């Protein structure tokens, strides 16, 4: 059965053989921007939604969607966008004060933009530029956490197509608002033995995860994840030959973090496929996606 909360969280219940119930989540919201104001010359000034790496937006195509359903295309640009004109085109800082959205409409002033129906508070969507390579890589913005959502959907597909009844009952959540800090905060953890958030795994610096692995997070900036549950996930990887790494993320929080902050009394863990260049032009590998799916199936008791 499936229900959707007033906040927008989708909850799916999966019947299992036993009485023990576990939770899974992935978030469907992602990064973007919002119209903050319109300049006298018709340029859209914006505020970011979530922690996108702003310099990577310079030159990116986007769409502005109005509240009455209209969509307009545009481009994120520096306020010094032309090498033939501006001395500081290379050095000018890329931030909200020094960037804008150029609309693909004949606008010369703020009134021209308003006549299109564009208002403060309208969302701005960034082009994902999604590609699947012959070598198995997936290149796209917002694999955080579209990859995690796809992995949970694949678990549902496998259970249905293979007619598998998992050992454990499962409550699966697709959350929103994770990128702004409160995605899973309203989830009722009553009756859950444990809870695993499926999000991107970090790649880079001294971390041992690659894009082909599933990353099991031991700790992030919100604190350590449940020691016993994390160890159990590692044991599943060892038992089933799943390529994995255990990592400590220096800058991160998850749906489990939001649940704990809200007072949920449940053991929580965090896993996900290795994703390179997070919150920028991200990349993972299908091997990492498949390893994550295998670990999820093992966790709910659906992998031989």
Predicted regions: what is each one?
Residues 1-304:
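N-terminal hydrophobic/helix-forming segments and targeting peptides
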